[in-house]
Design a protein with these regions (language model features):
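A polyanion-binding, active-site-adjacent surface
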Residues: 6-8, 15-163, 167-177, 182-185, ...
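Short, low-complexity, intrinsically disordered N-terminal peptides in bacterial proteins
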Residues: 1-5
């Protein structure tokens, strides 16, 4: 059985990592990689978790499945490697960031600095076949990422959750906790829905206000 090291997340997810469905999921993804192209690269499958350990989580931005075109998916929701053309949803996120906080538009789409500052950028499905959106959506990833969200109930620190679009908002029942929580819902930032309420939703300032109200430092949302 393949051993997955999730660092500090491992104790929170041990039951999932040992479950038969998870072994079958990894086997299926491995077979898909052997037969064709799967994104993100294998070493980046769990990057969202390893980049933002549980004790550092201050905000969670939930995505769907990874980008399915070459060179884009890097293991963080909405993020692309520096130098890659910005996908439309990310471009809209940056527009809202500028409107909300007055920050300059970033030069690139790598959101790793956010992850390192405590923003968990989690897709609900962690792999995808090349050119085939949602191709791995029914493989078992959602059971695993639901467990990640449910495990965060045990985190004692204040955490803000950002749920963009109806798919993300279905996860709201998993986010109950005795610790301080903020759940922000808005339409998805894709061009199809961004003008229905994503623009003007001001998530970044709301997250920082919530954190400061609960005695925490605000997130530094600046990007290169």
């Amino acid at each position: 059985m393949q051993v997955i090291d999730l660092g500090a997340w491992t104790p929170y997810l041990e039951q999932e990592l040992r479950a038969p469905y998870f072994a079958a999921l990894l086997q299926r993804v491995g077979a898909a990689r052997a037969a064709g192209t799967v994104y993100p690269p294998e070493e980046r499958t769990f990057f969202a978790l390893t980049a933002t350990p549980p004790e550092r989580v201050r905000a969670v931005i939930l995505g769907q499945d990874p980008y399915h075109e070459p060179g884009q998916a890097m293991g963080l929701a909405f993020s692309v490697p520096q130098g890659e053309r910005l996908p439309p949803s990310l471009r809209n996120i940056f527009t809202e960031l500028h409107t909300d906080l007055g920050l300059p538009q970033p030069f690139g789409g790598d959101l790793t600095p956010w992850a390192e500052r405590g923003v968990l950028l989690l897709n609900t499905v962690l792999t995808v076949g090349r050119g085939a959106a949602n191709s791995h959506a029914a493989w078992g990833w959602q059971r695993f990422t639901d467990a990640v969200l449910a495990a965060m109930a045990a985190l004692p620190q204040p955490v803000a959750f950002v749920l963009w679009g109806s798919q993300a908002q279905k996860k709201r029942p998993l986010l109950q906790s005795a610790a301080p929580r903020l759940v922000l819902c808005a339409p998805h930032p894709s061009p199809l829905s961004s003008y229905r309420g994503f623009f003007g939703s001001r998530p970044f300032s709301q997250i920082n206000a919530f954190l400061q109200e609960n005695g925490e430092q605000p997130v530094d949302w600046r990007l290169p």
